[in-house]
């Protein structure tokens, strides 16, 4: 199995997110940027890299992917709100597929982690339209696979639609 992303896959994800976002009347770029950073930290927390007292740190794979899928949702939403074009999709796909990401996103390296955590807010607010989307897809490619992340995202979006329909998480105030 290759760990590649296609333009068709990315365009499908962008459309799924656009369809979902159309259900959110209060959608706005600033809140989406904040949510993106929050979701990064929620995903990062599932790695438990700092829990050196545990024999096997890290939440189960499905929990990790669920949180990263949330980050992907906001990355897609940010791209859509910033009017991503097909040329940007090609740029994201080319970057994801071209780079090997060797030794990238090593959150077990304390110095790297400190630098990354300091810069995450700058990355999400960068003027380059593809940065938030590229970042989450690259993390997905390094720590899991593109297909695992896409599958987790689609599963999460089904649940998010159910929340908006009032058929899931009724007691959590989604509708």
Q: Language-model features: where?
A:
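Flexible "arm" and connector segments at domain edges
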Residues: 1-175
């Amino acid at each position: 199995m290759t760990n590649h992303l296609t333009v068709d896959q990315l365009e499908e994800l962008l459309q799924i997110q656009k369809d979902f976002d159309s259900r959110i009347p209060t959608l706005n770029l600033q809140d989406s940027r904040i949510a993106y950073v929050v979701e990064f930290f929620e995903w990062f927390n599932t790695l438990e890299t700092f829990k050196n007292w545990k024999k096997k740190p890290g939440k189960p794979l499905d929990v990790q992917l669920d949180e990263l899928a949330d980050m992907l949702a906001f990355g897609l939403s940010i791209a859509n709100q910033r009017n991503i074009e097909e040329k940007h999709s090609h740029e994201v796909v080319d970057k994801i597929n071209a780079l090997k990401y060797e030794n990238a996103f090593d959150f077990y390296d304390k110095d790297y982690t400190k630098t990354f955590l300091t810069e995450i807010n700058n990355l999400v607010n960068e003027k380059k339209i593809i940065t938030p989307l590229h970042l989450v897809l690259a993390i997905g490619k390094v720590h899991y696979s593109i297909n695992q992340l896409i599958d987790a995202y689609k599963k999460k979006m089904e649940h998010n639609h159910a929340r908006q329909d009032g058929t899931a998480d009724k007691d959590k105030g989604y509708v």
